[in-house]
């Protein structure tokens, strides 16, 4: 179970980084919202 949780967290981080790079021009607010959504999931 612990391993699964860790893997999930790593995946979320990768998604966040990818989104941030893709929408670099986007405002910081948008990035924060995206991060919150990922963590919620």
From Swiss-Prot:
Domain of life: Eukaryota
Region of interest: Disordered: 19-41
Protein name: Putative uncharacterized protein DDB_G0290655
């Amino acid at each position: 179970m612990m391993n699964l949780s860790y893997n999930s967290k790593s995946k979320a981080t990768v998604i966040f980084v990818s989104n941030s790079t893709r929408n670099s021009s986007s405002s910081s607010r948008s990035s924060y919202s995206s991060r919150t959504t990922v963590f919620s999931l």
